[in-house]
Amino acid sequence: MEIKLIVLSLALLLDRFIGDLPLLWQRISHPVVLLGKAISWGEKNFNDSSLPPSTLRRNGMWLTVGLVAACIFAGLVIRSILPHAGTAGAIAEVVIVAILLAQKSLADHVQAVAQALRDDGIEGGRKAVSMIVGRNPDRLDEGGVSRAAIESLAENASDGIVAPAFWFLVGGLPGLFAYKFINTADSMIGHLNDRYRDFGRFAAKLDDVANYIPARLTGLLAALATSLGHGREAGRQALSIMCRDARLHRSPNAGWPEAAFAGALGLALAGPRQYGAETVEGPMLNATGKREAEARDIDAALVLFWSTMSLMTGLVIAASLVGLFVG
């Protein structure tokens, strides 16, 4: 465990200060892109709308199980090879973990929404937010664009950073690879529409299980970061609203970080959402909070995000140091 804590500490720092390298991923496929291609292949070959729902559910389940097993196997193979490479192997493991985290890339995409609202108005904001959310941006006003960016930031703080870190600590590279596949599968086929309702059902449920603990950890970290940055009362407010409203969210997990961010920022988040021509109803989190969010609220959310990430990184580093000295 001490080694995994050290690797994760270095990976979190590398991802924070360097992040993704666009020039590299223009030349070779990012691992998540490869996962997406595998899912697309399976969906194309096994999600036939002429099949009965029970067959589609079974096809989706076996595709997901098979590809999760392949990811675990790949992780086991790489984990067995790296120790034989000495220092280069240790560096490679840090880089692999960093590649599968998303602190800087997530923050950059969300910051781009705030900047677009300032520079290009609502049309610029809609275009920028469409890069990070699946909902229909054409129906969003400035408040809707800003809330969508903040909601995506809160949810992906869990899905993109805390959860991968958690599963790496639990299962090493095999656990990390398996989680990234599950989360990617959920984002691609775990939708409640006619095309994916049956085929993606298993992937969606598996993602709910995989994110159960990380989502709640993310909310707690955000509330604690709020307390450290703005005082106990602000932290208690974030924690209280999280505990009160998280279960109102249509997702069993996304509501925890989103409600914590809503309470910390004094915003009303979630509520009805437009996906294409379909409206998905849902209650607001922190319904008495401010609804007319704007670019400066995105800025405040980014400050909270980085405070939360700093707290998590600090805890991981502290745990690794304790392990070194005690062990």
From Swiss-Prot:
<dbReference type="GO" id="GO:0009236">
    <property type="term" value="P:cobalamin biosynthetic process"/>
</dbReference>
<keyword id="KW-0472">Membrane</keyword>
<dbReference type="Pfam" id="PF03186">
    <property type="entry name" value="CobD_Cbib"/>
</dbReference>
<keyword id="KW-0169">Cobalamin biosynthesis</keyword>
<dbReference type="GO" id="GO:0015420">
    <property type="term" value="F:ABC-type vitamin B12 transporter activity"/>
</dbReference>
<keyword id="KW-1133">Transmembrane helix</keyword>
<protein>
    <recommendedName>
        <fullName>Cobalamin biosynthesis protein CobD</fullName>
    </recommendedName>
</protein>
<dbReference type="GO" id="GO:0048472">
    <property type="term" value="F:threonine-phosphate decarboxylase activity"/>
</dbReference>
<feature type="transmembrane region" description="Helical">
    <location>
        <begin position="300"/>
        <end position="322"/>
    </location>
</feature>
<keyword id="KW-0812">Transmembrane</keyword>
<feature type="transmembrane region" description="Helical">
    <location>
        <begin position="80"/>
        <end position="102"/>
    </location>
</feature>
<feature type="transmembrane region" description="Helical">
    <location>
        <begin position="61"/>
        <end position="78"/>
    </location>
</feature>
<comment type="function">
    <text>Converts cobyric acid to cobinamide by the addition of aminopropanol on the F carboxylic group.</text>
</comment>
<comment type="pathway">
    <text>Cofactor biosynthesis; adenosylcobalamin biosynthesis.</text>
</comment>
<dbReference type="InterPro" id="IPR004485">
    <property type="entry name" value="Cobalamin_biosynth_CobD/CbiB"/>
</dbReference>
<feature type="transmembrane region" description="Helical">
    <location>
        <begin position="160"/>
        <end position="182"/>
    </location>
</feature>
<keyword id="KW-1003">Cell membrane</keyword>
<dbReference type="GO" id="GO:0005886">
    <property type="term" value="C:plasma membrane"/>
</dbReference>
<comment type="similarity">
    <text>Belongs to the CobD/CbiB family.</text>
</comment>
